[in-house]
Amino acid sequence: MTSEQMAGNRFLDLSIEELMKIEVTSASRYSQKLSEVPSAIFVISQDDIRRSGATSIPEALRMAPGVEVARLGTDKWAISIRGFNGRFADKLQVMMDGRSVYNPLFAGVQWEQQDTLMEDIERIEVIRGPNAAVWGANAVNGVINIITKKAADTQGTLLSAGGGSFEQGFVGARYGGKINEETPFRVYAKGFTRDHMGTISRGN
């Protein structure tokens, strides 16, 4: 583990033995201990997201070193690793639970469509550097894997609300239940009121 990987992260509170046991999946498609991963990987935990007050995935990604986050409008973002930033960056593999959300029609990721409830994200794994051998041609500059909680871990009802500088107000609702003992599910909805803005704000 490098200091950069751990900086600003809740894992600083863990012992060396506990750090060695943390598992990630984005580096090689299967679960590995963080100490065994050869790539430069940074993990954003649910605790990190909650403490930061991030209301969207792009805002949460500002915590990852080496990730450039630019806000292009009310709900449009440009996100890249190792430069080459633009509205649709085609050299970055972005996944939700291991499945690519890359849109070949636009040759990039529509971040405004990745609007899952922040409370339902377990962690975000960010890998800097080429990983095309594992994740394909888009993974030239890096990989972002957004891993959500299992449906079995999000049972019951959740209501959330808040606001900010550009997002005047938002509300989210989620319900988790079971069809049977082996088939849990969850459904959610979000609504928001946003200011129109055209300036660019940049992250790391």
Model-derived features: where do they sit?
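Short, acidic, small-residue-rich periplasmic hinge/interaction motif at the N-terminus
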Residues: 1-50
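Non-catalytic regulatory/gating segments with a bias toward low-complexity or hydrophobic composition
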Residues: 19, 41, 49, 60-61, ...
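Residues embedded in well-ordered beta-strands within globular domains across many folds
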Residues: 20-23, 68, 122-125, 145, ...
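Extracytoplasmic beta-strand/coil segments of soluble accessory domains associated
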Residues: 26, 30-34, 38-42, 58-103, ...
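N-terminal periplasmic accessory domains that precede
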Residues: 57-60, 77-82, 92-96, 111-116, ...
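Short sequence motifs at beta-strands and strand-loop junctions characteristic
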Residues: 73, 136, 164-167
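Short acidic/polar hinge/loop motifs at secondary-structure boundaries
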Residues: 100-128
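Periplasmic-side early beta-strands and strand-to-turn transitions of outer-membrane beta-barrels
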Residues: 133, 153-154, 160-162, 174-204
